[in-house]
Amino acid sequence: MRSAMFLPVLFALQALCTSVGHAMQHYPAVWGHYDVCKSQIYTEEGLAWDYMACQPEATDMTEYLRVTLDPPNITCGDPPETYCALENPYMCNNECDAATEELAHPPELMFDIEGRNPTTFWQSTSWKKYPKPLQVNITLSWNKTIELTDDIVLTFESGRPEQMVLEKSLDYGRTWTPYQFYATDCLDAFTMEPKTANDLTQQTLLDIICTEDYSRGYVWKNDKTVRFEIKDRFALFAGPRLHNMASLYGQLDTTKNLRDFFTITDLRIRLLKPATGATMVDENNLSRYFYAISDIKVQGRCKCNLHANSCVFDKGKLGCECEHNTTGPDCSRCKKHYHGRAWSVGSYLPIPKGTANICIPSNHGPVPRVCDNAMLRCQNGGTCHHHQRCHCSPGFTGILCERARCQGPGDCDDQLSGQASLHHRPTGRHHTLTLVVFPLLFVSLC
């Protein structure tokens, strides 16, 4: 009778497990976030910490940057200026005045919340000094290493530039390398054959390309954006819908150049030539030519070397909240008194928990290599943890889980082979299903 009462619950749990399994198949990235740094486990000595590789969640990194323009007086409005529409040279009713809030277009409007009407945007001065080039450098600085997780997207309120370069720095702006070139004619502008991100392969992913996809004059709103395609590059390893994140994490873990490619401290947008409407420059109406950007999106996370799952913005600075006995803005060194072995970056492998590579106390002495996955295998279903300890399956004990755990006389008998066998003795107790054991039942069924 009692077992019959449990049947509906068991069937419901089985259905739930099945649906969870299907969800994991369709959205595999949910297990690949590495958002837990440690958890408590039971060992022979009692409760202990099990350490895992971890990283902060991805977020909108434009909330934490500092923007710099060069030349510094390139923003419109000082003195006030009237602009004409690129498509209609006779529509000259747009005014920029830095002294009037409603008419000003300062740089911070590239990072405010979009959706307001009218749209807010930064705007440069017009091309009044033609034929001298109208060029602007927009530098985004985080004073912290960050890892990009999604496409960089620039939305232009004006026509998209006819020539532009996106650059990155890994040393806080001391040196720069190009990420991508943009032009209406790549051969003419940069002596490069035009390509797209779809032309890249696993072998050429790190190549710097010039694309013509984002430099044509716009007619519709969707043609206002310029992208640097991060996800298309991820997809070369993770598949078109990023289902195989295990493959991507494996590549990032073992290929330093690949991981560095998606890591930055600064971005620089070099605007080299404004939109001209694919025609000759009208020297009689230079108020038509300028740059205007309404939005910049940079999605990423703090780089914490897989030693932290959170990052804080305090007193104008980003910093990792380090775990694993590490310290520093990037968790890139061991804490004081934790130099028992050299600091090491965490590892995504083995998936899904990775390897923490924690710093250990200085007086800990050399770390013995108790087990591995080759010669010194943990027995009876045990697992090797950081080469230092076997986590034994229930019912087994010993350095390599080689012995049965005996609870009392008669619980286990030594066999002639030197191995032990377990014997179950009925206790006569009756167990009822309660809310307390429900999560354990769910885990065991799944």
Stretches with model-predicted labels:
Residues 366-429:
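Extracellular juxtamembrane "stalk/ectodomain stem" immediately N-terminal to a transmembrane helix
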Residues 146-159, 166:
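A short beta-strand element within beta-rich, extracytoplasmic domains
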Residues 1-14:
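Classical eukaryotic N-terminal signal peptides for Sec-dependent ER targeting/secretion
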